[in-house]
Amino acid sequence: LRESKESWLDIITPPLRLLCNEIIKDVVSQHQYKADYVCAIDSLTMKLEGCIREICRRRSIPTVTEDKHNEILLEKLLDKLGEECNLDGSLLLTPCTHKLLMTVLTKQGYNLRNNIAHGFTNLSDYNLQNAIMVLHSLLKISAIKV
C-alpha cells in the first residue's frame, strides 16, 4: 500500500468475507447452492499479488526492473519475483509456499492472476477449487514475517 493508515487486512477483509460466505453456503448445501465466486476470486487474486510485492519491498527485494533500453521501469513478473525471494538465503518463501504461489498465479500453473487481469476467464473458472487455492495462498502469504 502506498503511504496510508490502512493495512492490507483492511483491504482484504471485505472480499475475504465474501469468499468465506460463498464457500460455506456452497459446502453446507452440498453444492446445491450456485455459489458466486467471481468478485471474491478477482479481488483476492489481485490483492495476493499486491501482498507479495509489498513483502518483497519490505525485504528490499526490487519489484521493478528496467526495460532492455534502460528507459522504462517495469514491474517484475511474479515468477521472476518468486525466484528472487530466496536468493539471499533467507528462505522468504518455503519451497511448498513458492510452488503453491507459482502454480496458482503464474504460467507454471493456472496463471490465475494473468487470466483475471486480462479478462481471459470464463464463468467456469470461478469455482470452489480456485476459491480454495486463492484462500490457501493468502493464508500462506499471511504467515510470512516481514
Each language-model region and where it sits:
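Short, mixed-charge amphipathic alpha-helical segments
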Residues: 1-4, 36, 79-115
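Helix-start/N-cap signature of alpha-helical segments
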Residues: 4, 8, 40, 105-106, ...
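Short acidic alpha-helical/loop segments enriched in Asp/Glu that coordinate divalent cations
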Residues: 26-44, 53-72
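Charge-enriched, short contiguous segments at helix-coil
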Residues: 98-146
